[in-house]
């Protein structure tokens, strides 16, 4: 009986040892798995950093001498294919439909293209044109032609008003008022009513203005003026000026005066040469 009891104790001891070994083995396996997982995560993180580093490097433009503007890096052979734009001469035929100020017989013709709603045109008319007029128009040195560029319905209605009577004096008077009062009518929902009021200042009744708005001939002249200059190679908008067919760079008094003086001198030399023949 005693021997059986000893055997049972021994078996229980062996069983306990086996369980501890199994637990130790499981613990070791768990530690191995966790260690491998950590290694894998570390490896993934390292790989991701490498990818990010590569992507970042690709997105950075090296700051060296190769990072230059097209003007510097463009080969000379390629530049020759794109030479600077030269002045292009446009032939203008002045006719009875044109509003001409100054000397209609002058060989120096200055053509102004304007839009009634153009703020720069209004600025030119009030600040630069008076000096130009005094210097060249009032002295009958040039023929100054005023032509419209129609961009909006407001432009069309205002231009029709200025041309309603058809003579230069009426045009000049209404043209002046339209540009001086531009900020009052051009951007108003009631611009037609305001233009009608302006017309009355120039001696045009509401009924006359209404008839002019329905005058296809006036509209055709305005559209023809617009289409003609729109085809000019260097035309970029209003106001624009052409001196004997050559467009000026801008509308400053110095730029226009330089172009006009040059044209006058050329005509003077031409006349002198013709007399010597």
Curated annotation (Swiss-Prot):
Q: Which UniProt keywords apply?
A: Disulfide bond, Oxidoreductase, Periplasm, Redox-active center, Signal
Q: What class of enzyme is it?
A: oxidoreductase
Q: List the disulfide bonds.
A: 118-121
Checking Gene3D superfamilies in the record gives: Glutaredoxin
Q: Which residues form the signal peptide?
A: 1-22
Is Disulfide bond given among the entry's keywords? yes
Which InterPro entries does this UniProt record tie to the protein? Thioredoxin-like_fold, Thioredoxin-like_sf, Thioredoxin_CS, Thioredoxin_domain
Alphabetized PROSITE patterns for the sequence = THIOREDOXIN_1, THIOREDOXIN_2
Q: What does this protein do?
A: May be required for disulfide bond formation in some proteins.
According to UniProt, the name of this protein is Putative protein-disulfide oxidoreductase RC0029
Organism source for this protein?
Rickettsia conorii (strain ATCC VR-613 / Malish 7)
């Amino acid at each position: 009986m005693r021997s059986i009891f000893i055997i049972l104790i021994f078996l229980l001891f062996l069983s306990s040892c086996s369980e501890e070994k199994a637990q130790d083995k499981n613990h070791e396996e768990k530690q191995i798995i966790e260690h491998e997982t950590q290694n894998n995560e570390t490896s993934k993180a390292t790989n991701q950093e490498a990818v990010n580093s590569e992507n970042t490097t690709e997105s950075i433009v090296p700051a060296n001498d190769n990072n230059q503007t097209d003007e510097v890096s463009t080969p000379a052979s390629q530049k020759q294919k794109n030479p600077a734009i030269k002045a292009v001469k446009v032939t203008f035929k002045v006719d009875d439909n044109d509003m001409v100020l100054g000397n209609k017989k002058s060989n120096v013709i200055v053509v102004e293209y304007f839009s009634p709603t153009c703020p720069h045109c209004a600025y030119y008319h009030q600040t630069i044109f008076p000096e130009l007029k005094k210097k060249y128009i009032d002295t009958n040195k040039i023929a100054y032609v005023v032509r419209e560029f129609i961009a909006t319905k407001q432009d069309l209605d205002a231009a029709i008003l200025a041309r309603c009577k058809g003579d230069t004096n009426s045009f000049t008077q209404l043209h002046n008022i339209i540009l001086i009062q531009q900020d009052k009518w051009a951007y108003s929902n009631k611009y037609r009513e305001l233009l009608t009021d302006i017309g009355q200042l120039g001696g045009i009744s509401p009924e006359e203005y209404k008839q002019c708005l329905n005058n296809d001939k006036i509209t055709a002249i305005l559209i023809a003026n617009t289409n003609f200059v729109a085809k000019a190679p260097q035309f970029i908008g209003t106001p624009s000026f052409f001196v004997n067919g050559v467009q000026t760079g801008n509308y400053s008094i110095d730029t226009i005066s330089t172009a006009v003086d040059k044209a006058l001198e050329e005509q003077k030399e031409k006349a002198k040469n013709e007399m010597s023949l």
